[in-house]
């Protein structure tokens, strides 16, 4: 029988999700675009939902993930903190390990 192995990775703390593919994409888009509203639009969610994800992650992890600057003459913006970048790197490593495992298991069928 031929089948394809699939997986979904997320990180939890005290049974609450702190990172998954959607949150990973949101943070990466904030890093790329320098804006929470632009990143939210890019990943197909409302600004309010994006902020709620960020605040929930920060609360659960006990760290600041985003540094924001209010709009105005020079414009606002958002940048990832060092801790957020570390979290993204760790999540990417974990995801890649799962990808390697599924490739290995698929070859052994």
What residue spans do the PLM features occupy?
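Short, Lys/Arg-enriched N-terminal segment that forms or immediately precedes the first helix
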Residues: 2-15
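Short alpha-helical elements of helix-turn-helix
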Residues: 17-27, 48
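Short helix-boundary/capping micro-motifs
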Residues: 33-40
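Central "turn" residue of the DNA-binding helix-turn-helix
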Residues: 44-46
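Residues within the DNA-recognition helix of helix-turn-helix
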Residues: 53
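Residue cluster at the C-terminal edge of the helix-turn-helix DNA-binding motif
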Residues: 59-64
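Basic, amphipathic "hinge/linker" alpha-helix immediately C-terminal to the N-terminal HTH DNA-binding motif
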Residues: 68-91
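Alpha-helical linker/hinge and terminal dimerization helices associated
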Residues: 87-106
